[in-house]
Amino acid sequence: MAEVEKTVRTLTGRVVSDKMDKTITVLIERRVKHPIYGKYVKRSTKLHAHDESNQCKIGDKVSIRETRPQSKTKSWALVEVVERAVEV
């Protein structure tokens, strides 16, 4: 049998919390068309992702990928920091 390569899901979002050790909370926003009215509405999802080196800060734009479950709520891992947050 030939090996079937599994596609890895990758998402981009903003870090909204970095208070946990080696874990970040990422807010993913998407636009969905309303089934009846046709208007595009913003929908959002919060995901917990593994950040091995604690390099992310609140406001950073990050890329995450799906992995095996790390804990009860964490099954995503940090791929890269796309854009650093502006410090004021």
UniProtKB/Swiss-Prot annotation:
A Pfam cross-reference name: Ribosomal_S17
**UniProt keyword annotation of rRNA-binding present:** yes
Which keywords accompany this UniProt record? Ribonucleoprotein, Ribosomal protein, RNA-binding, rRNA-binding
Q: Which Gene Ontology BP annotations are present? A: translation
Q: Name one GO cellular component term.
A: cytosolic small ribosomal subunit
CDD domains from the xrefs?
Answer: Ribosomal_uS17
Instruction: Identify the PANTHER family for this entry.
Output: 40S RIBOSOMAL PROTEIN S11 FAMILY MEMBER, SMALL RIBOSOMAL SUBUNIT PROTEIN US17M
The record's family statement is: Belongs to the universal ribosomal protein uS17 family.
The record describes the protein's role as: One of the primary rRNA binding proteins, it binds specifically to the 5'-end of 16S ribosomal RNA.
Assembly, per entry: Part of the 30S ribosomal subunit.
Protein name, per record: Small ribosomal subunit protein uS17
Q: Which gene encodes it?
A: rpsQ
